[in-house]
Amino acid sequence: MKYTLDYEKYAELARRVAAEGSVLLRNEDGVLPLQKGQRVSIFGRTQFEHYKSGTGSGGMVNAPYVTNITDSLKEDGTVQVNEVLEAQYREWLKDHPFDIGEGWAMEPWNQEEMPVSEELARQAAEQSDLAIVVLGRTAGEDKDNSAAEGSYLLTAAEEEILRNVCNAFARTIVVLNVGNIMDMKWVDRYQPQAVLYVWQGGQEGGRATVDVLTGKVNPGGKLSDTIAEDIEDYPSTENFGDPVENFYTEDIYVGYRYFETFARDKVKYPFGFGLSYTRFQTESMGLAVQGTEATVIEKVTNVGGMSGRETIQVYVEAPQGKLGKPLRQLAAYAKTEELKPGASEELILKAELTELASYDDSGVTGHKSCYVLEAGDYIFYVGTDVRSAREVGRVTLAELQVVRTATEALAPVQAFKRLRPFFFGENDHAIANWEDVPLRTIDLTERILRERPTQSEYVGDQGWKLADVYDKKITLEQFLTQLSDEDLICMTRGEGMCSPKVTPGTAAAFGGVTDGLQQFGIPVACCSDGPSGIRMDCGTMAYALPNGTLLACTFDPELVEELYEMEGMELRKNKIDSLLGPGINIHRNPLNGRNFEYFSEDPYLTGTMAAAQLKGMGKYGVTGTIKHFACNNQEFKRHDANAIVSERALREIYLKGFEIAVKQGGAYSIMSTYGPVNGLWTAGSYDLLTTILRKEWGYQGIVMTDWWAKINEEGESGSKSQTVPMVRAQNDIYMVTADAASNSNKDNTAEGLADGRLTRAQLMRNAANICCFLLRSVAMERLLGREEEECTELHSPVSTEGAGDSGQVLARLELPEPKTGEEIELPLEKLSTKKGTGAVYQLRFTKIGRYELVFRMSSTLGPLAQLPISVFLNNTLQQTVTINGTEGKVVEQSVTLAIRQDGEKYMKLYFGESGIDMHRMFLRYVGKNDIESFRNE
């Protein structure tokens, strides 16, 4: 069966999603949508340089193009753009080019702005009917935002633009091309007529923004976060960014759960809020209850003058009981179809009370380590945001109900206090009270020893292949008895980055990563960074999709699922089995640099959006690796900062989205985090990965570490080579090693097996998890030649050659017949290693054979920086190598080139990220022997 990856349809769908996720916060006097023939002046350099995404691994998609707002407005033709002002900007940009930074995590949060004087604003106003001011921000992996000018706050230059433009123009629209929410106090200062968050909409973001501005799409986005008056109003700000210990003292009171319970007056724009160009009237049609399931029916009527969509949100207020609860919890949401003026739709929303059960981590209810519904009234509210929701009915429980019995797991070991509400008199908001957090009472070491598998068998090679398990001729357990201890150990190692065993430029290969494993018919699976598109560091292009925050703001999981069907097709086309995403960490604080990758401050919205992505990709036999499990809520010192969290907050907030993705989305690949939670680095946390994930949730997939993660034994510091706890915890794969067979990371798994800290049965258990993933993968189908679906392409603008410029020829070299071991210098005088640049050497080979291209280089960046170099011969990729930041130390990397024919060749280097200092580069002749063993050319 053939399926078609239609890139025009892909672009149209991504554009629609980006428009649907745009959030209109203000629209005075109906200034939007723009009207036909209006004259518009556009201010702010981001009008030309649209941020498609944030930075780091989640943003490194080589997009074939990125649309911007100004060109898209002119392409649309609805309005007349002030071309005099546009020309001034374009001339200024020639001397003030976009600053891409000096490498990994060195990109600036914002870009320098062209000064806008009172006179310039006045002149533009004389030629225009209204103004659009475009402001841009970015942040990302290894780089949090800051409560400073140019990041969370406006710069002085931006303040000047807004002040002068708003004074000169009667109508001003502000467009925010940002990954995170930002400080919004300037709205009160300057009073622009309209404010529109367009987030980071991928490569179609510019066109999508214009669709909203011109009314082709009525903005239906709703905030997936609460925008407070000030950054200090978020309770997590006090502890956010601590380099050593981050105490989650706000506990379960994150986002609107905090503000609606304790600080209603600190909210500028509430969770779930977003305006439309039309008006809707909502009417409750009743609340029906069957058991613990409540059904809300809400009639929505478009009483305005434009077609549009509305989102209905259901919140529940649970009785305070003995545990204390937030005054609102999102229980369900639904979005209408496109309603024409006068049209109506009845939405049926179902809310399961058991999903709102509270976890008793102290035993105060008499049911320690249980999820409970305490006795009392459960009040249902329905509205279009959390603040406007009105009561529609109540469900009364006469007595406490135990919903689920769990096991104490991952409780903190350090004492601290957490927030809980205290209500006094008739107040509709709580007073902050504090209580001691329950600490761990179980013996974790004893639990691990008691539960570890010990029975295993080694029978040697019986001639069975993994295909025999696939065809149900033998069991997986039988198959694994053939594998030696060394085979099982090698299987715990993923190879990368940019392993030549899988799709070029991708993050890792795993499964059959050694010759020995491949002899048993174990395929090599491939994963690639995401979540907003496929990252291929060799320069291969892929579609850049709207980012996580924008997707959540659509409140439309069906639309997101449809988009990720297309992503699934693209993954399959590129022979990639898993996208490293969605990212589903909670927006605990607006300053987290990777919030753009994640969805929301709410775990229910987060989980349902993640499930939608997984379902979409799953329709084409591929999947996503949900990440980062768990509490990856700051980037600063993310390798070592200890997240200290109550067990209740973990289960109700920070793990809940993952639980939904597993149970509703069918997740079968998960990535753990870099840092520790309650003293244990998550990559080796038994209670997280076995007790909760596998035993309680019934998870049957794989778990991989984040790239070059640390692991520890309790009470010890983290180490990249300490893999014994990793295997024991069922974190199945360490990501990544350069070579699995040689144990290039020098991990201690074999040592642990020899001294009894590990058993062969534990290794077999992890191998079984990996094989279960492989058995359902397209990699297995490809290996067996049974791939049923074939991908064809339509309208493809995507190149499989290197991205970036084609590169200037830096040197032309005639290579004399070299002797074995002879080194031939390549000149570096004109070489640029900036991100996206290409450099070409014209080489005339006079001797066939094997050569090594050797780089001697350094980087001032830290060890988590990822700096890829791709090498092409005559536009054919030879290999991509990735070095990590070396903190100034000189290192050596090499690429093997097999020259089978003499004559002239063009060797191109493509640098995927800035930050490399090249000290020396040369070709070394190795010889003619074994040339056929190399896959190059």
Residue spans for each PLM region:
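N-terminal beta1-alpha1-beta2 submodule of the flavodoxin-like/Rossmannoid cofactor-binding fold
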Residues: 856
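Extracellular acidic, Ser/Thr/Pro-rich low-complexity tracts
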Residues: 302, 859-861
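Short beta-strand elements
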Residues: 388-408
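Glycoside hydrolase catalytic-domain context in secreted enzymes
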Residues: 1-388, 406-838, 842-852, 868-913, ...
